[in-house]
């Protein structure tokens, strides 16, 4: 997966062959969290990503959208409450191409990065709440004199 996320998608015209079942199986080993599915006779890879908060899913979908624009390879993105489902396939060949697995790897990387950012933000917020709990403000807040109101 590490090498896939560093690759760039190549332009894909209708004369490029779909991946064979053996090629799909080999690439799928690099993206084990992704499910290979067939929808309306077209193979695709899909994964549902979970989030603690709805806005984090929106951020993720936006980041994947930007990656898709940069690579000129676009997924189907379904945003649900605290979940985002991505479906990758190559429309011009009505099936799977290496580009789909490249974008799966890039999507996974974007997800892990967002989880790290969210975790770091939560740690800072928890530390702040421990230092100044909302129910126990510092004594100087609300004091009318220069002394602590304790």
Residue ranges of each PLM-predicted region?
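A charge-rich, low-complexity, intrinsically flexible signal that marks solvent-exposed coils, linkers
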Residues: 40, 113-150
């Amino acid at each position: 997966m590490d090498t896939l996320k560093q690759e760039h998608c190549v332009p894909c015209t209708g004369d490029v062959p779909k991946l064979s079942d053996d090629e799909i199986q080999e690439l799928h080993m690099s993206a084990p969290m992704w499910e290979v599915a067939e929808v309306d006779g077209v193979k695709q890879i899909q994964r549902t990503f979970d989030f603690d908060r709805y806005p984090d899913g929106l951020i993720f979908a936006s980041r994947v959208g930007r990656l898709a624009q940069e690579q000129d390879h676009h997924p189907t993105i379904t945003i649900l409450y605290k979940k985002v489902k991505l479906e990758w396939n190559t429309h011009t060949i009505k099936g799977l191409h290496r580009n789909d697995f490249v974008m799966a790897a890039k999507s996974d990387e974007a997800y892990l990065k967002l989880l790290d950012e969210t975790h770091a933000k939560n740690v800072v917020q928890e530390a702040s709440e421990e230092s100044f709990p909302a129910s126990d403000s510092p004594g100087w807040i609300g004091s009318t004199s220069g002394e602590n109101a304790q």
